[in-house]
């Protein structure tokens, strides 16, 4: 039986012209965006499994991206994912597992590190209080030390910017001093501006000399790698007081016409500040038209840096007690320098060379420890310009370590320093070479690499030698006897340089250094009397000058000049 046919009802026609109005049917259905790039070849594809979640999808893309080109995509994925629904697993039972404490026993050169538990001899580093005494000894301290050794390849994995950049730590250092809430920022300057300064200063003039020194043992010049000489741990007291705690500077501040007082370690850092990478700070006191540049007790000026300018400088490991952390390497380098300086001298009473005055920091009646031989020479430098209304003179305390005699039997001052190698396995990271295998045949290349990795430290040593007026610098190469033992070292060789020649090789400009010092002094002399702190930014090449309350660092401050003048 044929079904009936019925015409649909037509909308009433209001006018006799035009089509009828369309009824609003389906107006509440949301619009699904689409793209012409969507694959529309199949209505439904039941042969490809939908990925469970994002983690599985990323894993498949990483492992099979080259084999399976077509990935699962929801219709409309090319334009928007608002209406594309992807099923995900229930993550209510998901939990994070901490795997940071898992010890990996097998490692490779590209992955991870190894935790080694070694028993070493602890060094005894003593720092005095207000007198500025800094002593070191080779004492033994028992104790187990967990050492974290890594070639730097166990870092975080991420986007690859360059060769092995994926495993390098981000170098974020902490400031040497915490900026207080009551500190006021006065000025800041970038290193690019400091490097353009220039001032031709007069040659330093000796004002007075204190202490005594011994002759240099020339047998150290004959040391070779095959005839390695062990570094001895000698108990000697070393003094490195800050400026305002120096009784000689206190006397000169009252009687001389100098208006800037500073020590050679602080002055050399200011003159070489554009080469510095690690953070540091200097306390500046402006009092009655005179400036005093001080260091904080136990601060960066009491220790030496290691590979500060290297491309991959030492970083703080997870275990900060490791022997290759920056702090441990700094203490080790200071310990090596002090012992090498004492061992390289012939300590005989007949050959002792006494300066006009005794050591101003040592009192034999109150202290019984043996004193390290040092000569303290106070020198005056004229930094005045023709346009200055008042002369600007700088008084600096310099140091000499020993002496040699020329063919005319005249005494010539020398400076004795030491470079240290802490782990030959890090040579591929820092760009250096193994000293024990290359020092004999490529001594020039070894020293050139050290000038690159320790540019700031060597530049400071050169400036200190030029300020003291020494004739020669003796630089020793000291390496660990065992890469895991930071207490036993061997002397592999000694090289001698003229300070002026070394400055020329390092492209070190004294006129630029004097320009930096004069610029900072001019800024501080224009400020009212008070205390200021010059801070090197820990992560950027910037110097900042802060005004601080008078009682800042008061626990480390020495006697004031007014008190010394009335005493």
Curated annotation (Swiss-Prot):
UniProt-annotated stretches for the region RNA gate: 300-314
GO CC, any one term: cytoplasmic stress granule
Disordered: region residues: 12-34, 122-160
Subcellular location(s) of the protein: Cytoplasm
Disruption phenotype: Reduced rate of protein synthesis, although the polyribosome content is not affected. Enhanced sensitivity to caffeine and defective spore formation.
Xref: InterPro entries: eIF3d
Domain of life: Eukaryota
Gene Ontology molecular function: mRNA cap binding; translation initiation factor activity
UniProt keyword annotations, A-Z: Cytoplasm, Initiation factor, Protein biosynthesis, RNA-binding
One GO term of the biological process aspect: formation of cytoplasmic translation initiation complex
Composition skew (Gly residues), residue ranges: 128-142
Major localization class: cytoplasm
Free-text note regarding domains: The RNA gate region regulates mRNA cap recognition to prevent promiscuous mRNA-binding before assembly of eif3d into the full eukaryotic translation initiation factor 3 (eIF-3) complex.
Self-association state and partner proteins as the record states: Component of the eukaryotic translation initiation factor 3 (eIF-3) complex. The eIF-3 complex appears to include tif32/eif3a, SPAC25G10.08/eif3b, tif33/eif3c, SPBC4C3.07/eif3f, tif35/eif3g and sum1/eif3i. This set of common subunits may also associate exclusively with either moe1/eif3d and int6/eif3e, or with SPAC821.05/eif3h and SPAC1751.03/eif3m. The eIF-3 complex may also include SPAC3A12.13c/eif3j.
Family annotation (HAMAP family): eIF3d
Similarity field: Belongs to the eIF-3 subunit D family.
PANTHER family per the UniProt record, alphabetical: EUKARYOTIC TRANSLATION INITIATION FACTOR 3 SUBUNIT 7 (PTHR12399), EUKARYOTIC TRANSLATION INITIATION FACTOR 3 SUBUNIT D (PTHR12399:SF0)
Function: mRNA cap-binding component of the eukaryotic translation initiation factor 3 (eIF-3) complex, which is involved in protein synthesis of a specialized repertoire of mRNAs and, together with other initiation factors, stimulates binding of mRNA and methionyl-tRNAi to the 40S ribosome. The eIF-3 complex specifically targets and initiates translation of a subset of mRNAs involved in cell proliferation. In the eIF-3 complex, eif3d specifically recognizes and binds the 7-methylguanosine cap of a subset of mRNAs.
Name under which the protein is recorded: Eukaryotic translation initiation factor 3 subunit D
Gene name of the record: moe1
């Amino acid at each position: 039986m044929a079904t009936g046919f019925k015409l649909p009802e037509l909308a009433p026609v209001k006018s006799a012209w035009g089509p009828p109005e369309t009824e609003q049917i389906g107006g509440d259905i949301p619009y699904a965006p689409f793209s012409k790039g969507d694959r529309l070849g199949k209505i439904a594809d039941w042969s490809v499994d939908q990925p469970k979640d994002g983690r599985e999808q990323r894993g498949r893309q990483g492992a099979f991206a080259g084999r399976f080109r077509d990935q699962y995509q929801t219709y409309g994925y090319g334009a928007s994912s608002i209406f594309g629904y992807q099923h995900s697993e229930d993550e209510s039972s998901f939990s994070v597992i901490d795997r940071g404490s898992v010890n990996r026993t097998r490692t490779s050169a590209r992955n991870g590190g190894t935790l080694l538990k070694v028993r070493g001899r602890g060094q005894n580093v003593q720092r005095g209080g207000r007198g500025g005494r800094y002593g070191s000894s080779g004492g033994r301290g028992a104790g187990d030390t967990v050492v974290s050794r890594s070639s730097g390849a166990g870092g975080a994995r991420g986007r690859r910017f360059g060769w092995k950049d994926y495993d390098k730590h981000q170098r974020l250092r902490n400031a040497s001093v915490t900026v207080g809430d009551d500190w006021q920022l006065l000025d800041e300057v970038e290193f690019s501006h400091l490097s353009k300064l220039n001032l031709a200063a007069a040659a330093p003039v000796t004002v007075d000399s204190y202490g005594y020194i011994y002759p240099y043992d020339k047998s150290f010049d004959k040391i070779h790698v095959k005839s390695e000489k062990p570094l001895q741990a000698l108990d000697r007291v070393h003094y490195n007081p800050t400026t305002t705690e120096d009784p000689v500077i206190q006397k000169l501040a009252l009687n001389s016409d100098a208006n800037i007082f500073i020590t050679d370690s602080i002055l050399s850092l200011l003159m070489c500040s554009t080469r510095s990478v690690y953070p540091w700070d200097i306390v500046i006191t402006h009092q009655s038209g005179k400036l005093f540049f001080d260091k904080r007790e136990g601060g960066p000026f009491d220790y030496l840096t290691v590979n500060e300018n290297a491309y991959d400088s030492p970083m703080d490991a997870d275990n900060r007690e490791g022997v290759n952390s920056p702090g441990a390497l700094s203490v080790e380098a200071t310990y090596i320098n002090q012992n090498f300086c004492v061992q390289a001298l012939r300590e005989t009473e007949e050959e002792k060379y006494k300066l006009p005055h005794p050591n101003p920091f040592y009192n034999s009646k109150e202290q019984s420890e043996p004193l390290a031989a040092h000569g303290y020479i106070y020198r005056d430098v004229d930094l005045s310009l023709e346009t200055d209304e008042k002369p600007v003179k700088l008084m600096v305390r310099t140091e000499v370590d020993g002496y040699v005699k020329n063919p005319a039997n005249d005494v010539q001052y020398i400076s004795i320093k030491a470079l240290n190698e802490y782990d030959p396995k890090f040579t591929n990271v820092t760009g250096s070479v193994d000293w024990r295998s290359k020092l004999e045949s490529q001594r020039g290349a070894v020293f050139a690499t050290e000038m690159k990795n320790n540019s700031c430290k060597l530049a400071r040593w050169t400036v200190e030698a030029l300020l003291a007026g020494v004739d020669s610098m003796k630089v020793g190469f000291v390496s660990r006897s065992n890469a895991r033992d930071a207490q036993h070292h061997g002397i592999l060789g000694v090289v001698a340089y003229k300070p002026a020649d070394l400055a020329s090789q390092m492209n070190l400009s004294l006129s630029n250094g004097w320009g930096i010092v004069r610029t900072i002094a001019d800024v501080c002399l224009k400020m009212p009397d008070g205390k200021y702190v010059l801070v090197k930014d820990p992560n950027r090449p910037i110097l900042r000058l802060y005004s601080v309350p008078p009682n800042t660092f008061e626990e480390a401050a020495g006697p004031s000049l007014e008190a010394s003048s009335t005493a």
